[in-house]
Amino acid sequence: MKLKLFGSTLLVAVASLVVPAHAKIDELRFAYVDNLQDDHGDIVDGKEGSNFEIELVSSSPDFLNFIGSPRPYAMVSANTTDDGVNFGGVGLLWRWEFADGWAFEPGFGYIVHDGELDNPFPDDTPEAAAFSEEHQLLGSRDLFRTTLALEREFGSRFAAQAYYEHMSHGQVLDTGRNQGLDYVGLRVLYRFDPDAAD
């Protein structure tokens, strides 16, 4: 089931990026991220482990000029274990260069995942406690994805980013349980067009 959902998400994500004929693929990105969570004010390793991510970023189509010319992306994220969360989706990235070779890049998107939505066991049972201890309970099959990245360029075609991503339904896509997912990691970028980031 997880493999089918993940494969379907990948196809939808790639198709949505390829459909606009006037946009072209500008960047290919590879990332490694770790799941983190807040444990009573302390940031600790999350329940969902680590993921590898691939992202395609296209040029900004003209119809997005009115919101600052963000660039559309499609991405997939595969967990390194059998028990973690896989996800994929689409979104928009804004990029601002604030110093020579340095840029800040926020993003907003939409993902579909194969993680746990709720606890299948009755409340206040040992099984429910054990399940909650091992899984983030996300409440909705689809989630919003927000990202913040700090980028350093290495020449005209390569760059690296330290970034944070948060995913949750925000009580908009669904109601009720909303533990969300948080990841931090590093990604490397290859630009097919050296002028793509300008």
Residue ranges and their predicted role:
Residues 20-25, 59-70, 97-104, 157, ...:
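Short loop/turn motifs that connect adjacent beta-strands in outer-membrane beta-barrel proteins
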Residues 26-42, 69-80, 167:
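Transmembrane beta-strand segments that form the barrel wall of outer-membrane beta-barrel proteins
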Residues 26-30, 68-74, 88, 102-108, ...:
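Transmembrane beta-strands of outer-membrane beta-barrel proteins
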Residues 32-37, 105-147, 151:
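Outer-membrane beta-barrel translocator/channel fold
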Residues 52-58, 90-96, 108-110, 148-152, ...:
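Residues on the lipid-exposed face of transmembrane beta-strands in outer-membrane beta-barrel proteins
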Residues 180-198:
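Outer-membrane beta-barrel "beta-signal"
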